[in-house]
Design a protein with these regions (language model features):
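N-terminal pro-sequences and low-complexity stem/linker regions of secreted or lumenal proteins
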Residues: 1-98
Length: 98
């Protein structure tokens, strides 16, 4: 079980870190997220770059699904701007634990 609590917009709060350049839609400004799961790392703050597509990335990886074209395009746009692809939430999880 995994519950991700987040929201889509920053609500007008100023952020001192500029969002990375990618395609015309994002990723946008940083927003907080909380991961609730028995597989979540305890007392862990993940500093990886995520966006709303990270939830789709996690589902794709977890269930070994084909990568959606939009995710591939976003990754290519980030790479073209010298950035790494966005995370898939697995950095905050201990998936090898049963």
């Amino acid at each position: 079980m995994l519950v991700v609590v987040t929201y889509d917009e920053n609500g007008g709060f100023w952020d001192h870190v500029a969002p990375p350049k990618a395609d015309r839609w994002g990723p946008g400004s940083r927003v907080p997220a909380i991961i609730i799961s028995p597989f979540a790392k305890r007392y862990y703050v993940d500093h990886a770059q995520y966006d709303t597509t990270s939830i789709l990335r996690f589902i794709t990886r977890r269930f070994d699904l084909p990568k959606l074209p939009g995710l591939t395009e976003r990754d290519a746009a980030l790479k073209a701007n010298g950035r790494k692809p966005l995370g898939d939430l697995t950095g905050a999880l201990r998936l090898s634990v049963r």
